[in-house]
Amino acid sequence: MLHFVANMKRAVALWPFTSHRHFTEEESKRHIPFQRVAAAACGAGILSSLAYAPDQILMTLTGGGVFSLSHSVGVAVCVALVFTLVVMSYRHSMYAYPRGGEYEVTYTNIGPSWGILVAAAVIIDCVLTVSVSVASAAQYFVSLFPFLAGKHVYVACAMLCVLAAIHARQRHRMRALWAIPTYFFVTIIVILLITGCIQLLTASGEGVFVAVPPQIHEAPVSVGLAGYILLLRAFSLGCTVMTGAETFSYDVYRFPRPQSVRAARSLSKIAACAGLLLIALVCVSQYGDRLISPLTVESSGTYPLSEAVSQKARIPVIMQVAHRVFGPQTLGTFIVVIATISILFLAARMVFHTVTSQVSVLALQGCMPIYWHHRYSRFSGAYAWMLLICVAGVVVVMTQANLATLIHLYAVAAFIILTVSQLAMIRYWNTQLRERQTGGARKQTLRSRSLNIVGFILTSIVFVVILATEFIQGAWVTLAMVVFLYAIYAAYRHYHTKLEYEVNVNQWDEACRVPNRVRAVVLISKWDKPHMRALAVARASGAVTVEAVALAVSATAEDLVREQWRELGLPVPLTILYTSKRDMVALLSDHIRLVREQYPHEVLSVYFPQVIGKYWWESILHRRITRALRLAVMDIPDTVLTLVPWKRAN
């Protein structure tokens, strides 16, 4: 059976390969990628949000008419400015804790409870990142191939399987390929925007882009509180562009030395690039297409606005712009879609490393079982990301791969992480200020603390805005999942702490006392080689007494057992238990308890054989009495279970 399980594991992970964590220092240097490669890989999470963040801003503002839609660029600029300030303050955590991530920052400075909360939010954020990425990729794929309309769930699940296959067979030599999707996506989007702007500026008459449809002109020009709430909702949905920033804190080790400096610079460059591209996409969409293009709505206004929006919402903004610039079903549009899907794939795949690292740290800190720590098994990391794939698949199926529904769940966990980590860094700088520092160092510390205070205020405001505007739409689900996972981690940590206290060895602990004597009991169900081998091992163990215990179902069977025992002539006392219509496991465990009560200061060693077959399927053919008896005897104190294997001959 063990060989069958091992073969099943190998079917998933295929051939083994060396982990870079076990290399020497010189060998590890050769496996660290260039800064451009590491920055592109880590920045995929931020840049991939450009595939759906502009859609959410424009789709939200379309419901408010001209007044709201005219502020789309302002909303994008606000998102970019807030993102810039948050990144400026977030960089300090990479300098202070280059290998810890948000969990270690919070765990060290605020306490274990807050650290567990951040860890739960990180896991939920990773699940939602994979779900949103594959749902968005499926939306682009279905938009490119219309015959797959209505099959979003199947396409997203197929993409999850492809992601699992790619991640299972990654190689260190393939790390240079990580940069290709990021640079390819940025290059294609820049070309798309430049071409669109040139066509928009040089167009005359009808032009390449169309103006606002007549239905939107009929919307009220001035709105009250509802319009401003709509702007806040658009801002909160646009803040999904910030959700990939926490990836850098977990992947600082991927950068060449000095790792913290290079990681912080790369984060700043990626954030600036994402902010500029977000503003540019929203500008082109607002002044060009207004989200509703002639591809689905005629300029004469034959469709009502709600129906037009529902039809056009299925086509992402980037693809709409590509349709207007390059034309539908052209090579340019195909390249744009492929570039977008590739960056979404890379963003989802990079999350696997974050989950594996976070789960490993949690296991090491006593918040999860220790076998989840990757250093103890090369399959423990595979368990983490395979579970991530399964949970993400469940989320995709439950939401029907609806990107709008997933976006409402998405940003909550990310801003829990950002807000709590900013608070932890404020505590960190307060601790540094209590120490004696020179004038220059103290000024630098005060400046860093001020930036983190600004970052904490901004992330708190954004978090409150997200909760206020998206709570009913689904933010409460994310909060519930984070609280549920936090409760599991906290409960296991409490159990682990109590267990460590109970098993802790003191100098005069009772567990250190040497028992007076050891008694052996051999369970015999029939006279064969496995049972005789178990009896021989028990006699050779040096026990003060060895007792053979056999079972008989009738008086005739009891006489036969005694006759066979006399023929063997072994100098071992025999005890026969009568088991007519009674559970033999319960009868044997009762006898062992009776022997244990008669000799309370001695250790009782129970021997029983087990036949080991040559093939995995042979274990199915044998009785399960050995396992049931082992479970029953384990509850008896000061009782040692000894399994004597008997392997079949080849």
Could you say what each language-model-derived stretch is?
Residues 2-59, 95, 106-109, 113, ...:
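Membrane-interface "cap" regions at the ends of multi-pass membrane proteins
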Residues 371-383, 418-471, 509-511:
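C-terminal membrane-solvent junction of multi-pass transporters and transport-like membrane proteins
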